Design a protein with these regions (language model features):
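Short, acidic, small-residue-rich periplasmic hinge/interaction motif at the N-terminus
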Residues: 13, 19-25, 32-35, 66-70, ...
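N-terminal periplasmic accessory domains that precede
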Residues: 84-89, 130-133, 152-154, 172, ...
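Extracytoplasmic beta-strand/coil segments of soluble accessory domains associated
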Residues: 131, 135-177
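Short acidic/polar hinge/loop motifs at secondary-structure boundaries
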Residues: 176-206
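Short strand-turn segments of transmembrane beta-barrel domains in outer membranes
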Residues: 193, 202-209, 221-251, 265-267, ...
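Face-selective signature of the C-terminal outer-membrane beta-barrel domain
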Residues: 294-311, 330-516
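Gram-negative outer-membrane beta-barrel transporters
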Residues: 495-498, 625, 644-834
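C-terminal beta-signal and adjacent terminal beta-strands/loops
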Residues: 628-630, 634, 639, 817-898, ...
Length: 973
């Protein structure tokens, strides 16, 4: 910490007052927020628009006045005595204001890369889902938005990459974190399609290194601020070919200075097929926010409380094209409540103290309901056994549930299944800030603590009729413990003239009750710096740089994995006269293996950038490097296993007539007994021993993943007439590079484990391979031809914006060009062979050759009777070729081969582009119309993929959006 006890504080303080008015009507504006920049001093205007800020230090002061629906105004002056700023006039935020922006703006006051997106930009872009903001960031590419697409936010990354980038991207709404850690079905960030976009006032995207206040994060953060303050009634409707959206919002100024109450109602629905608009996703959101500032002598207390609920989800029940009475329904119900108390104490001698208490609770209901039709001409075994051992199928009887094998009916029937997930989270945060000016420097100390609790109260998968339930085992999520995390953080920010330094440390303590992982702690240091080299009216240059570590806590999928089951058919009798066959199975329960060496995933980030202004032209650059360590990964651990199998030929010597037989199985030995229904005589059938492996999952840490890139924005006016026409040019883009290779030792067999009869002279083998190309922790890593990928991309957007303030009109023409789209599968740190022919076993060492079939050898292999010994594979293969043909064939089966000769060829797509057009027109002060057309030239050109040498049409290729359009109208009442 910065020790300043020896410094001589400047105790000269003054009072600043003023009167905030509407520029058009000259009426006072109530509840406007007046802030003194850098000093954390603030006040809210009263019913007469008046404000008073006490104890403002002498010297240069910058005051920022803002309120909902108005353009923020900054007033700069030198204070040397009590100052009355008289009337501060705020202009309504509309298109009659010259210089209105409809793009993401980089915040120049931050020490890291942060972009802000305001309401005007959201309206002009007709944002339907929070994911749509990705197109507004430098180099972002437009997608045709629909709520049926549940894509997740992932900053500075692309799809198909290792490192769980989406899982590490955090989302906050009014300070409340959207938590998806308790999900049992995915390792991703929270879904955003249940968030109302009509009630958003602004969005802040922290793409760089966030402050230590923010934890459980590894790939940036998106902060959403909803509307708060007095507004007229706003009715909004928008539509595109697949989506309809209507919304009503209002901000009430309560009588007797009782605060403000904002509420919003929104309905949105998206269809999967425009020709059959029955299968759809819908959201129905009601939200309300109350805000009140209590004024006390020398202090203020700001109370904010909010409640948001959504009832919606996916539903295909009404689709007439589906099989009769079949449907799929997925709830996406959400309830979020949050409260914040912000107490400001302004001390004349000690500085400014802010104490903030935040509390939030959220619960989500994601139950799915599926009704499917099925049929069978003969009985089938439905396995519900939950313990290791042998069991034989039985006819269903009332009360039978889990723990048995039942015979399904014959004919036609429906199966109704449910998957129930109910995610709950509780958040408490207490933060204290001490800000003081010492001579020309401003020092801000932040200390805080945070408690988060997450759990899943769902019941997992279950069926409404056990008689019809297929093979399935229960896993009740509500029995899982709650995961708690406690964090403590401290940060200091020092501003000295043109230099700003920020440094902090965060400690996350994870308390995992009911899990072998117990309690774990992790430290996250973070530093940022900003220096203004040149600060002039027409020329400026600012540099910023930072370093930070951030830790991502594991999901319930990692901490409490469900058991998996392997069922092996051990006896197949002939069918009875009524078509029944009483199969016997051996069930092996596979529980995830605890990994005492598992570490929490974290990222180390470095960033540097600059912001420059020359006249009216602006330039910003951000270069970043991000390495993700210990990404969560799933693999299988194999153990030798033997079981007894009885073939149907064993019945040939059975003296009991087929119609008189009753079958049973010993649950421990697997011996099949045939009993006469007439006289009770029993015959034990002979069996053979089969040798195989059982697989248990284990969560481990994968190899590091590296990402780096460059983002840039250049803006310049072409015509700058504030009254008639404004024409500006913006060129933004990004270069991105990703490389991820997995060096984890992966056990498996590419052609399946299989089994062998005892005494056959052979035994099952397991190969151990270096790495896998599986990218998600939700999927078990298996042997693959590649163990990594390199991804490079460069996109360039050129936006021409025309503004006609007198007509209240703004138009944007945007050309999105992809200059580089390069991917290549990698195989490193392993024995990789370039083959002359697809079926070859040997060849030349692979060093990046193209147009070759490729084979990958395991590094080791092990045998069934000695699994702990890992035998070097390459040497054994050469030795067995001439000396042991049987072993040689088995070893050849462990080779992983590419299916094509171009698998390792670079996938380099030739350049392509898409042109988008947007226009917004205000009719007076009360009506606003917007229209957009994506890919309005309907580009049907072809691109060449160098991996195969083939050309592909851009139409429906996924490289650019299809021709798409939408319109919206907003009416203020």
């Amino acid at each position: 910490l910065i020790i300043s006890a020896a410094a001589i504080a400047d105790n000269i303080r003054f009072k600043v007052s003023g009167h905030v008015l509407d520029n058009r009507t000259m009426q006072p504006i109530q509840y406007a927020i007046v802030k003194v920049s850098n000093l954390e001093l603030w006040a809210a205007t009263d019913a007469n628009g008046m404000f008073i800020i006490e104890n403002v230090p002498q010297g240069a002061v910058s005051i920022e006045v803002s309120t909902l629906g108005y353009v923020t105004r900054t007033v700069q002056f030198n204070i040397r005595h009590n100052t009355d700023l008289k009337n501060i006039r705020l202009k309504e935020a509309n298109l009659s204001i010259p210089g209105v922006e409809v793009t993401a703006r980089k915040r120049s006051t931050m020490g890291t890369t942060t972009y802000s997106i305001d309401r005007t930009t959201l309206d002009h872009s007709q944002v339907l889902s929070l994911n749509d903001i990705m197109a507004l960031l430098p180099g972002g590419q437009t997608v045709n938005s629909t709520l049926t697409d549940d894509s997740r936010l992932a900053l500075r990354s692309t799809t198909g990459e290792k490192g769980n980038a989406s899982f590490g991207t955090a989302i906050e709404i009014d300070g409340m974190r959207l938590n998806n850690n308790a999900s049992m079905s995915e390792t991703q960030s929270a879904s955003t399609r249940n968030i109302s976009t009509s009630n958003i006032e602004s969005i802040e995207v922290i793409a760089g290194i966030p402050g230590v206040e923010y934890g459980d994060i590894s790939n940036g953060m998106v902060k959403v601020n909803t509307r708060r303050g007095h507004t007229p009634w706003i009715v909004e409707a928008s539509m595109n070919p697949y989506t309809r959206q209507v919304a009503l919002t209002k901000g009430l100024a309560l009588a007797h200075n009782a605060g403000t109450l904002n509420f919003s109602i929104e309905h949105a629905q998206s269809f999967t097929d425009i020709t059959s608009p029955h299968t759809a996703y819908s959201r129905n959101i009601l939200s309300t926010t109350y805000n009140k500032v209590f004024r006390m002598k020398g202090s203020s207390l700001n109370l904010t409380a909010g409640l948001t609920g959504n009832i919606g989800g996916y539903n295909s029940e009404a689709d007439p094209d589906a099989f009769r009475d079949t449907y799929q329904r997925q709830r996406d119900n959400q309830l979020r409540a949050n409260m914040m108390l912000d107490w400001l104490y302004n001390s004349r001698s000690s500085g400014v103290f802010n104490i903030t208490l935040q509390a939030a609770f959220s619960t989500a209901d994601r139950r799915s309901d599926n009704n499917t039709n099925t049929s069978s001409s003969s009985t089938q075994a439905s396995l519900h056994t939950t313990t290791n051992g042998y069991a034989i199928a039985q006819d269903y009887a009332d009360g039978m549930g889990t723990g048995s094998i039942i015979l399904s009916p014959t004919g036609y029937w429906y199966v109704r299944s449910f998957n129930d997930q109910k995610l709950q989270s509780l958040q408490l945060k207490l933060k204290g800030e001490w800000t003081r000016r010492i001579l020309s420097a401003v020092n801000k100390l932040t200390v805080g603590t945070e408690l988060n609790s997450t759990r899943n109260n769902g019941h997992g998968t279950y069926y409404d009729d056990m008689r019809l339930a297929p093979t399935w085992r229960p896993y009740d999520y509500s029995l899982l413990p709650t995961m708690h995390s406690l964090a403590m953080f401290i940060e200091e920010r020092l501003t000295m003239g043109r230099l700003m330094l920020v440094g902090g440390l965060r400690n996350d303590i994870t308390i995992i009750s009911g899990s072998e992982y117990g309690t774990a702690a992790s430290l996250s240091p973070r530093f940022n710096a900003r220096y203004n080299i040149i600060k002039g009216k027409n020329v400026s240059l600012t540099l910023h740089a930072g370093y930070g570590k951030s830790v991502k806590l594991p999901s319930f999928q990692v901490l409490y994995p469900a058991d998996t089951y392997t069922d092996r058919l051990v006896f197949t009798p002939g069918s009875t006269a009524d078509g029944k066959a009483y199969y016997a199975y051996y069930t092996n329960v596979q529980r995830a293996i605890y990994n005492s060496n598992l570490k929490w995933q974290h990222s180390n980030q470095m960033e540097a950038g600059l912001e420059a202004m020359v006249g009216k032209a602006r330039l910003s650059l951000s270069a970043y490097w991000n390495r993700t360590y210990n990404p969560y990964q799933t693999l299988n651990v194999y153990s030798p296993f033997a079981y007894n199998q009885t073939s149907q030929s064993a019945l040939e010597g059975c003296s009991i007539a087929a119609a008189d037989r009753i079958y049973s199985v010993d649950p421990s030995t697997g011996v099949i007994s045939v009993t006469s229904a007439t006289n009770g005589n029993t015959v034990n059938l002979p069996y053979s021993i089969r040798r195989t492996y059982t697989a248990n999952r284990q969560y481990v840490n994968g190899s590091p993943v590296t990402r780096y890139g460059l983002e840039w924005v250049a803006e310049m006016p072409i015509i700058n007439n504030h009254h008639t026409l404004g024409l500006s040019l913006r060129i933004d883009g990004k270069y991105y590079h990703y490389r991820g290779t997995d060096n984890t030792l992966i056990a498996g067999c590419p052609n399946g484990i299989g089994d062998q009869a005892e005494g056959s002279g052979t035994q099952p083998l397991i190969g151990y391979y270096v790495g896998s190309n599986v990218a998600s922790a939700s999927t078990t890593s298996t042997p693959t031809v590649s163990n990594g990928m390199m991804n490079k991309g460069c996109s360039l957007n050129t936006t021409l914006t025309a503004r006609i303030p007198q007509l209240r009109l703004i138009m944007t023409m945007r050309l999105e060009a992809t200059m580089l789209n390069y991917r290549r599968n990698l195989s490193s740190n392993r024995t990789t062979i370039a083959l002359n022919e697809a079926g070859d076993v040997t060849g030349t060492k692979y060093v990046g050759q193209t147009d070759h079939y490729v084979a990958v050898y395991p590094k080791y292999y092990s045998t069934w009777d000695n699994p702990s010994e890992r035998i070097p594979y390459a040497e054994a293969l050469l030795a067995a070729k001439d000396n042991n043909p049987t072993l040689y064939r088995q070893l050849c089966d462990l080779i992983v081969r590419s299916n094509t000769a171009y698998y390792f060829n670079p996938q380099n797509i030739s350049a392509y582009y898409s042109a988008n057009f947007s226009v917004t027109k205000e009719i007076g002060r009360w009506v606003s119309l917007s229209f957009y057309a994506n890919n309005f030239f309907n580009n049907l050109a072809s691109v060449r993929n160098k991996q195969t040498g083939l050309k592909t049409s851009l139409f429906d290729s996924g490289y650019i959006p299809k021709f798409y359009y939408g319109a919206s109208v907003r009416v203020k009442l």
